[in-house]
Amino acid sequence: SNPAVSADKKNEMQAAATCIDNSTGNVVAIIGSRTQDLDGYTLNRAYQSYRQPGSSIKPVIDYVPYLEKGNTPDTIVQDEYIQDGPKNADGTYMGSITLRTAVSLSRNTVAWNVLKELTPKVGSSYLLNQGFHKVWMDKEYNAIAIGGFTYGVSTEEMAGAYATIANDGEDRRVTCVSQIKDTRGRIVYDSSG
């Protein structure tokens, strides 16, 4: 870190992560921030901060709905310049490529066109159905195809979405609660089923 910027430790970079058991949705590790020597309230960035997900959202909002519509990894898609649209990170365009290649190379133009075909409303409905909290207002904007949200997403939401993909589409709601008992010790909720 740059000592001129972070000598007081207030401006150092922060990070957050949520790791879950994909088969259950149970949180196994969570990082909410750097260690802080503060009394009182501290922000847990894994649950309370919403950030732009960038390309990590593409499988969830673009490609899963596109595959469910009947396309395959071998479907031919167009990687081409889009007027008033995104550019690819490397500044190049490959023309006709397979969806598999587009995903593996994270081609922004393909993600943009896929969501445009599906409609942002359809793509955002996948997020809403998986418990994403702050995406409802972006359902008309194609920028969400490449992670451009008004408020962003949390690491907890992203972990749940990827767990759903890992479980062949079976929803995995993320939870830190493993069990709840009533005053008599009877189990009223058990996350294991």
Which residues are covered by each model-predicted region?
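Glycine-rich, acidic and aromatic/proline-enriched surface loops and short helix-turn segments
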Residues: C19-Q36, E68-N71, G95, S104-N108, ...
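Second-shell loop/turn segments in exported
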Residues: V5-S6, N44-Q52, K87-T92, T98, ...
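Active-site-proximal helix/loop microenvironment
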Residues: H133-V188
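Active-site SXXK
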Residues: G25, Y50-V77, A102, G160-I165
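Conserved catalytic neighborhood of penicillin-recognizing serine enzymes
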Residues: N71-S124, D171, T183-G193
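Periplasmic/cell-envelope proteins involved in peptidoglycan metabolism and beta-lactam response
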Residues: S1-Y47, R51, S56, D74-T75, ...
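Extracytoplasmic/secreted proteins, especially bacterial periplasmic and envelope-associated proteins
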Residues: N26, Q52, I61, T72, ...
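Extracytoplasmic
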Residues: E12-A15, N26, S56-I57, T72, ...
